[in-house]
Amino acid sequence: IYKEIIIPDLEFAVEWLDKGNDATTTQPTKKAALGMLAKVCLQTKEYATDEYIPEALDAAKKLITDCESGGSTYGAYMYPTYEEVFAEKNNKENKEALWKHRWYAGSDGHGSSNGNFKLNRNDEKFLCNINKFGAREDNQTSRLTWEGSQAGIFMPTQYLLNLYVQQDGTLDPRFHKSFTTQWNANRNYEWDESSKNNFGKEDAIVGKKLNTGDLAIKIVMPQDADYAAEVSKKVTANYLIVDYKDVYDDANKNVITERGAGENMFRYFYPSLNKHNSSNYYVANASKKRNGNLNATFIIRMAEIYLIAAEADIYLNGGANAMGYINKVRQRAGATLLTGSASVRTVLDERGRELCGEYCRFYDLKRTGMFKDNSYLQATHPDLARYFKPEYALRPISTTFTNGINNGAEYQNPGY
């Protein structure tokens, strides 16, 4: 399907699509097609062939050259700083996005609120359950703010968070720009006996109060400058201090689910990816908290192209230029530049740091052979490795379809 349909279609698109501009949304442009061509050609590596890797590198280099020379041919661009990429003011006309998509909702376009709020729902997926602490509550007012209040379903693994620890022991600057680690109270709150016990506070905390707007929750990493000071007052402070070590077990590379004889309540609080946060909503039904996120989601952006070039260079040239591509991304982020030769794992780790939460990881691990057995997961996420089967590298055709026809087995993904 790559050879006969996907790649020829993208080559045709590169030739015939318009250049577009930064305001172009949903409709693909020439740079979108070229970026996807680079990505798709690289993905064919999972089939143990280098046939399309030269085309992947060539497409990536065209965009890189254009980006570094002003973008006159394709409009390629990379923001000078990492935080500009996900600043909400840059969302609608994001210069770095090679392709982005926005949904529309409004009273002129929908007569019912039954489904018109189901737009870009990425903002609903990554927030930890801050409402497990009484100074926070899930309400409509908070849902419309950038920090939000709806608990998500995606929690960073121990492995992911430790990718942000640099060789000198400091945190990669992208960590605190990508993850929210503290929240203010959105209601008045008074500590009670139950909360004291749940969070290991001293007896004197009972009766102490937090007012709306006060610091309520603070997650601290061992690499933070104020880590020791914050941990030293964990049982006395009138706000909730969550130590990384209360949530993650570095030795076992997993999440700590039990504390003493009971549940570990700290596990509900973890660094929460904020790339998809929004304060731009269409309110379909306020009483039911049905709000449609009007922000765009980025399908592919320029920083990824440098990492595609790095990986393709490893396959074709032994990585002679790979570290240079990787360090372009790191330099923009303000991270420590890497030295030595780059391996595929070097690229994978950098993709984890730069592209976390941008829905690339499954394809990255599949492409690089990390799903051939459970060894990669055993080293990075052993709790998950116990349940892994090689067939999980394949996407199944839904049984809703296959069970509804007499010859459904013929349509299942071969090998699943």
Residue ranges and their predicted role:
Residues 1-18, 24-64, 99, 175-177, ...:
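Extended, hydrophobic/aromatic-rich amphipathic alpha-helical segments that build helical scaffolds
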Residues 5, 85-160, 267-299, 323-331, ...:
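Long, intrinsically disordered, low-complexity segments
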Residues 21, 48, 71, 190, ...:
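Residue-level detector of alpha-helical recognition elements and their boundaries
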